[in-house]
């Protein structure tokens, strides 16, 4: 299995009515033994490529081989050794966890003692053992992804194609999912993980960066990040707010991209630019600008040619709201909501002041949506107050 590879030779896919190919001619090789990330924004061609590798779409030109099999000509042989987990869970939500596993085992012709041993291993691997009788539709997003992965692994595939498995999954479940996938890769499985999340891309040993159907980069994320050394900066001004400061900076020819980060403005400068160019630029107020550690996101945006330096249309129509700075505008006081004996929120207290961006963080089932619904008047609190 350590020799398992995917090879693409001029692989291309076009759809009627599109000016550009969904996947431009691709040439690359993907190896087993570690997780390879297929990274790009929505519409980059990630799902189309995955479907061609799984034999679900026929390429218009070029070819692919997956561990020696042509996905179209040898589809039966390939499907026996390939696991494909699509963006949608691929689960039957009106069936229980065990019923879903049994269905996939039937489809894979896994029977008898082999089925029993496989289920025991997968239920332990995914920590779904206590939930075998629960309907799939009643599982959290993270648990659904674990069940989807378990169903995909029933046939013990040599190749695993995961199409954006981290979407809609809370950070704790996503971390557990990554641990499971890294363990599988360590056993020699070939794993291709599709994502638009750049923090996920950094967890991959190798990445394929795509945009508008084209492959822009293949290699280690760290190697690409290192190309941004000396070009990432944090900027503040004692005389101007960050939003106005960002608008000014984005109009400068020396700036490739910028965004507000906490209490600073993060800038990516073009290769030939220096911090002094920004300090002395016409129209810029007094600023403090210091180099910061580059991120993979900086390199990715720069590779795309920058995210655009024109003023945001939305930002242009937003105006400062009058009010007392520091005034509390949203408040939860002992906010509690119970559904029967279950407390979805339990005496929650917080206050949001004018001008703040307040993050309400937590895993699936933590009570975030319930809190929002009470704040919006869509749910009546069991006790406590929601003030807006």
Name each model feature, range by range.
Residues 3-6, 13-209, 329-330, 334-388:
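ABC transporter nucleotide-binding domains
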Residues 83, 109, 229, 304-305:
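A generic structural signal for secondary-structure junctions
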Residues 222-227:
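Short acidic-hydrophobic catalytic motif
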Residues 229-303:
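Short, charged/small-residue-rich alpha-helical element at the C-terminal edge
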